[in-house]
Design a protein with these regions (language model features):
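PAPS-dependent sulfotransferases, especially Golgi type II membrane carbohydrate sulfotransferases
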Residues: 17-34, 41, 45-48, 90-232
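Conserved phosphate-donor/acceptor-positioning beta-strand/loop module used by diverse small-molecule
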Residues: 59-60, 69-95
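Extended catalytic-interface subdomain
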Residues: 1-19
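Alpha-helical scaffolding segments of alpha/beta enzyme cores, especially the outer helices
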Residues: 39, 69-72, 130
Length: 232
């Protein structure tokens, strides 16, 4: 991502085993990296002759760690928060980091990777929950993975309505994209928490407040889905 152009952010941690860098990065202010990203966006827009009226769509988990900095640099940003079962999030993050890190490092422990990405995912979610309390409702929307998987048109209509955009001109392109990806669908990425020294109970306990606060459907330890609803 463009934030990484400042040698800042967890992209590098997902590719190399660099705990010293991770500790340094955690203590660095994020605003300079986001200001640099804003300048890069201006440069890209100018070079591609993009209309300033066309919004940028930026997606990276890094933003969850840096929401105050992001909103300082982009105060009018509209935020789309996507939600998924933490079991899948942590397992996927650990697997991604593991498969990238083993390319560049000779001695990598999968359990160390699992522990670090559980910690980092918890930090991302905690910071997001804290900042969400002060973000106006008109500036943020929540989209659930299961809802998108079950009825993507309705979910995308909600997003477009939130952004004040007409979805109709874009629907055909979305449908064609899904048709192409379905035709060339690869073997699903498989992983397990146990591979990375983690357990269902540990992850569930770590993110229980999150799943309750955002009505996230979590799978039970047996693999069955259970709706977790926020208490009144």
């Amino acid at each position: 991502g463009l934030v990484a152009a400042s040698m800042y952010g967890m992209k590098w941690e997902a590719q190399w085993h660099v705990p010293g860098y991770a500790n340094w990065c955690a203590g660095e202010p994020a605003v300079p990296a986001y200001r640099h990203m804003a300048n890069l966006l201006r440069l890209i827009g100018w070079s591609q002759q993009e209309s300033s009226l066309r919004p940028w769509v930026l997606k990276t988990p890094q933003h969850m760690l840096d929401l105050p900095a992001l909103l300082e640099v982009f105060p009018d940003a509209r935020l789309i928060f996507t939600h998924r079962d933490p079991q899948a999030i942590v397992g996927s993050a650990a697997s991604l980091a593991w498969n990238q890190t083993i390319i560049y490092a000779d001695d990598v422990d999968p359990k160390t990777i699992g522990r670090e990405w559980l910690r980092k995912t918890d930090l991302m979610v905690s910071r997001m929950q804290e900042v969400r309390q002060i973000i106006p409702a008109s500036q943020a929307i929540d989209v659930h993975f299961d809802d998108m998987d079950r009825d993507w048109r309705t979910s995308m209509k909600r997003v477009y309505d939130f952004l004040g955009l007409d979805i109709d001109p874009a629907l055909y392109g979305m449908e064609k994209y899904l048709d192409r990806t379905a035709a060339s669908k690869r073997t699903p990425h498989s992983y397990s928490l146990a591979e990375f020294g983690l357990s269902w109970d540990e992850v569930h306990e770590c993110f229980e407040s999150y799943t309750q606060a955002f009505d996230v459907t979590a799978k039970s330890s047996s693999g069955e889905s259970s709706a977790v609803r926020a208490s009144s």
